[in-house]
């Protein structure tokens, strides 16, 4: 059918393994061309955020080199810190449940049960705190999306908010590791 998008979620090749072998993904990129989106679960890309950034960047660069213009979807990443890092690494689509479980505030991700009362007040019902947090988190995610668009058109890290220096330094570390630029970023 041509009226639906097809996404392929790449998983570890062997049962019992919890990491994707990026070399095999890169060697088999041509087999991904029938798909509109390719996806990875965040934690299967590597043991550290930096390892995941490297994996995303290598996949993105190989895809671009092979003219495979397909968005990369990272499952399990939708928070104020890792989402911009993975975006700078070459990922395009993000989703996760953190926005339902935590409060995105003070440029961080905070546990609702303990931080909610300190932000909203100790007399506010926890159900109300949760509802307010969801609304604020949704607005945060929309703002983040707009910030990505501004960054994409200007290249100015300040568009990424108060953590922009952290993102810039992290991106520079990534470039040193992969030995060059990330296409499209």
Please tell me what each predicted stretch does:
Residues 1-69:
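Conserved alpha/beta-domain cores
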Residues 11, 40-42, 73-77, 95-97:
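Short His-Asn-centered micro-motif
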């Amino acid at each position: 059918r041509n009226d639906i998008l097809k996404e392929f979620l790449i998983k570890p090749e062997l049962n019992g393994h919890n990491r994707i072998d990026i070399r095999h993904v890169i060697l088999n990129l041509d087999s991904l061309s029938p798909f509109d989106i390719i996806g990875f679960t965040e934690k299967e890309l590597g043991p550290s955020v930096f390892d995941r950034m490297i994996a995303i960047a290598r996949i993105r660069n190989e895809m671009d080199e092979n003219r495979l213009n397909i968005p990369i979807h990272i499952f399990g990443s939708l928070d104020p810190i890792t989402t911009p890092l993975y975006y700078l690494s070459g990922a395009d689509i993000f989703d996760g449940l953190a926005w339902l479980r935590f409060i995105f505030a003070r440029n961080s991700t905070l546990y609702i049960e303990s931080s909610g009362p300190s932000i909203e007040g100790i007399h506010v019902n926890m159900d109300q705190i949760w509802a307010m947090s969801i609304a604020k988190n949704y607005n945060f995610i929309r703002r983040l999306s707009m910030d990505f668009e501004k960054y994409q058109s200007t290249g100015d890290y300040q568009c990424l908010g108060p953590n922009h220096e952290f993102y810039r330094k992290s991106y520079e570390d990534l470039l040193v590791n992969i030995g060059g630029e990330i296409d499209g970023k």
